[in-house]
A protein has these predicted regions:
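Aromatic-glycine-rich donor-binding/catalytic loop that engages nucleotide-sugar donors
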Residues: 117-134, 143-154
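C-terminal catalytic/acceptor-binding lobe
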Residues: 138-212
Length: 212
């Protein structure tokens, strides 16, 4: 299995996630912190592949990078760094269909998910105009539903420290108060316009919504 995981801070929770993996896996860490990490883990089932970035790509761009790095997969498995898997979760996730988006059955539904190749072929990638976080999942789910493709809920028993990134950093929390509203408006404008497009990365939005 290949797991894609963006991370900005709380590398202790990333360690917990990696140590909870119970299948042979390569974990592709998209390190958005701008700082190289001396990462130690204790799981013989896991190989680590680090992508150290000079600045924060944001969630949508990180998910897209993970897909682009692995273009020959039939499904892409993506997880939050602050997730902890229960035994059997990843085996269940590995049953995800290649024509569907497979989410967790409990909120937050996108904490760990799979995107099938037929979805990416038909719907495209995540909207990188939504930076750095929030509403990229709502937008994609809406686009998938509009395309008539399945959205499946899997009964994963994992645990998740929701919003650990912003809750552990005062500056991130303050910036999120601004960028959340901006992304909310961006998403609402797409809905109002009946826009089901992939969207585009915008230099202006990237700079204005920066958490760097």
């Amino acid at each position: 299995m290949k797991l894609i995981v963006p991370v900005l801070n709380r590398f202790d929770l990333l360690t917990r996630m990696v140590n909870s993996v119970d299948v042979e896996a390569t974990v592709y860490v998209i390190n958005n912190s701008g700082v190289r990490q001396d990462f130690v883990y204790d799981n013989a089932l896991v190989n680590m592949h680090w992508v150290d970035l000079p600045s924060n790509l944001g969630v949508a761009s990180s998910w897209n990078l993970g897909i682009k790095m692995l273009p020959f997969e039939s499904r892409w498995f993506i997880t939050s760094a602050d997730t902890c898997f229960a035994p059997g979760d990843l085996s269940l996730l590995d049953s995800a269909r290649d024509d569907a988006v497979s989410l967790c059955s409990v909120f937050p539904y996108w904490q760990t998910f799979a995107v099938g190749q037929r979805v990416v072929e038909q719907v495209g990638l995540f909207d990188e105009g939504l930076h750095p976080i929030y509403f990229e999942d709502n937008d994609y789910e809406r686009r998938v539903a509009n395309a008539g493709l399945p959205i499946v809920k899997l009964d994963l028993a994992l645990t998740h420290d929701n919003s650990s990134t912003i809750n552990s950093n005062i500056r991130f929390g303050a910036r999120n108060n601004v960028t959340f509203v901006d992304n909310q408006k961006y998403f609402a404008d797409k809905v109002e316009a009946d826009n089901f497009g992939q969207g585009v990365w915008s230099l202006l939005r990237r700079r204005n919504n920066s958490w760097d």
